[in-house]
Amino acid sequence: MIKAVHLTHYYNKDLALENINLQINKGEFICLVGESGSGKSTLLSLLSTLLKQTSGQLFFEGKNYKDIEDIDSFRRTNIGFIFQFHYLINYLTVKENIKLAKEKATHEEIYNLLKILKIENLIDKYPNEISGGQKQRVAIARALINRPKVIIADEPTGNLDSKNSLNVFEIFKRLSEGGTTIIVATHDKDLAKFANKIYEVKDGKIS
């Protein structure tokens, strides 16, 4: 599904990633573990087309990223993003926050997705009326509403307690079993055990 070949990236003259070779298959649950500043977030940004690599090649389903004409459309169609901070808009309901990602999403479509995440009762609630763990599930729903082939999550449980963190990774596991490719950066090696593959990122290299 996603293949990185000799991927290298610099920020100005500072080396962030060096000679990364990586194959990620459909439905795999991949965890990138490592300390802050190790290169995890940079790698996620490159894999998701948010950054353009300094050198090397990236492929999605066999097609070179550089040959994709409308990169914004590609990203919206194929990739869902989840971050440490959920970025929900407080004056919009849960339903309205999700519709930001897909304006034409129906009530039934949103309700069914929230039901999978066990928060369907929150559909008309506002963010300030729900817990941190529930907010992150809403963020997951928003990432899933376009039925992306890949979910990319950067420290998605950084602000959650252990119970809610566990719940989020259980959701990721179920999604991967359903065929969605999951790529998560985390510093929590215990949570990473949910993944099919774990890569350690250190000083811009993976092992």
Show the residue positions of the predicted features.
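Helix-to-loop junction immediately C-terminal to a conserved catalytic motif
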Residues: 48
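Conserved ABC transporter NBD signature motif
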Residues: 56-66
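ABC ATPase NBD coupling module
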Residues: 65-80, 177
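Conserved ABC ATPase "signature" region
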Residues: 106-122
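Conserved signature/switch motifs of ABC ATPase nucleotide-binding domains
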Residues: 125-128, 145-146, 178
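Conserved ABC ATPase signature
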Residues: 126-136
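Catalytic Walker B motif of ABC-type/P-loop ATPase nucleotide-binding domains
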Residues: 151-154
